Design a protein with these regions (language model features):
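Active-site-proximal beta-alpha core segment in soluble small-molecule metabolic enzymes
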Residues: 3, 7-10, 18, 25, ...
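Active-site anion/phosphate-binding pocket segments in diverse small-molecule metabolic enzymes
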Residues: 2-13, 17, 67-68, 86, ...
Length: 373
């Protein structure tokens, strides 16, 4: 990450703490919180966000990759869990650093078990169950139960928990996810009966499940997008009290009047109809400012919306600043956030891009400095 650039994001860690507490408030007192801080905490900064979540009462930190887990293990002693697949080449690292992993494949589990026994340790693992996401996990049929039973009884693996993931919890119709919950609980019950081994921590509910499905809170909840201040979707039956944590700002690189008839940017997709004050913003698609915002998006300045003109470039884009005639180079604009009662929010940007909030914030690249406030 660069030490200074004329574009940066500000992360309000107090808002992260507030959102983590809001997630925790949905669940019963004895339910654990696994804060999902994968993908650099959805672009917000994994180390800083993790500390804020721990301050707010989180019990576990959830990541997607070995590298993410090791980054956090260098700072924190709390349980850190990799939610996805851990390659065999990383087994030594996860054993040495006490990283919890997801297990679901017997052949891979046997290799992990052998590595753990060789090191004289037990790996703490959570059994991943595929209840309908069709991505990773043991199936809930007889063959899946046999595989899970074999894993649970391996000496070098302590199966602390079992988990799955809802595929439609953010939709208004909860029929499918109710089926997932029923399949999950039945499978884990059968596994315990077959092996005589207790699965201490069941977890299934991410942000949408936390808000709309209290019956899915089980032993641990996994807040993700709600930690960063956003509702999982507009179809939710309930609304959480959340505060967005991210603001994206920039200082203008050039402000100049260009004559009518001038075309702007690559391929000249925008032609000035009159003499226009054009301001150049030093951020582009290499920073995560999506090229699909070309000739569609806007930035904020002094309570006004300045529309993007021309295509978003790799490092810059241009806006029509005619409404602010005294604007000058070095003045500040807001790419995401609020200014004098006017806003451009992550959900609004997601709608413009026909995507979800998660992608908007995850796409903000590491060359954009994060400043914590």
């Amino acid at each position: 990450m660069e030490a200074y650039r004329p574009t940066w994001v500000e992360i309000n860690l107090k808002n992260i703490e507030h959102n983590c507490k809001a997630a925790k408030a949905f669940a019963k007192e004895n339910v654990k919180v696994g804060a999902v801080v994968k993908a650099n905490a959805y672009g917000h900064g994994a180390v800083e966000v993790s500390q804020a979540c721990l301050n707010a009462g989180a019990d576990y930190l959830m990541v997607a990759t070995v590298g993410e887990a090791l980054e956090l293990r260098g700072r924190f002693e709390v349980p850190i869990m990799i939610l996805g697949w851990t390659p065999e080449e990383s087994y030594d690292q996860i054993i040495a650093n006490d990283i919890r992993v997801a297990v679901y494949d017997v052949e891979e589990a046997e290799k992990l078990n052998a590595k753990a026994l060789q090191a004289g340790k037990q790996v703490i693992a959570h059994l991943k169950v595929d209840t309908g996401m069709s991505r990773l996990g043991v199936q809930t049929d007889a063959a899946g139960l046999e595989a899970a039973a074999a894993i649970v009884q391996m000496e070098g693996i302590e199966v602390e928990g079992a988990f799955s993931h809802f595929s439609k919890a953010d939709e208004a119709d909860k029929t499918f996810v109710h089926g997932q919950l029923e399949r999950f609980n039945r499978f884990v019950d059968e596994l315990q009966d077959r092996t005589g081994k207790k699965i201490a921590i069941r977890h299934l509910g991410a942000s949408a499940g936390i808000i709309d499905l209290p019956e899915a809170h089980l032993d641990m909840i996994r807040p993700g997008i709600m930690l960063y201040g956003y509702q999982p979707s507009t179809e939710m039956h309930h609304v959480a009290d959340l505060k967005p944590a991210l603001t994206w700002k920039a200082r203008l690189g050039r402000v100049t009047v260009l004559p009518a008839g001038r075309v702007i940017g690559y391929n000249g997709t925008y032609e000035l109809k009159q003499d226009t004050l054009v301001a150049t913003v030093p951020a582009g698609y290499a920073d995560g400012y999506n090229r699909l915002l070309s000739n569609r998006g806007y930035v904020l300045c002094r309570g006004k919306k300045l529309p993007i003109i021309g295509k978003v470039c790799m490092d810059y884009f241009m806006v029509d600043a005619t409404e602010i005639p005294d604007l000058k180079a070095g003045d500040e604009v807001i790419l995401i956030g609020e200014d004098q009662g006017v806003s451009i929010t992550v959900p609004e940007m997601a709608v413009m891009l026909k995507t979800i909030e998660h992608e908007v914030t995850c796409d903000i690249s590491l060359r954009v400095p994060r400043i914590y406030v």
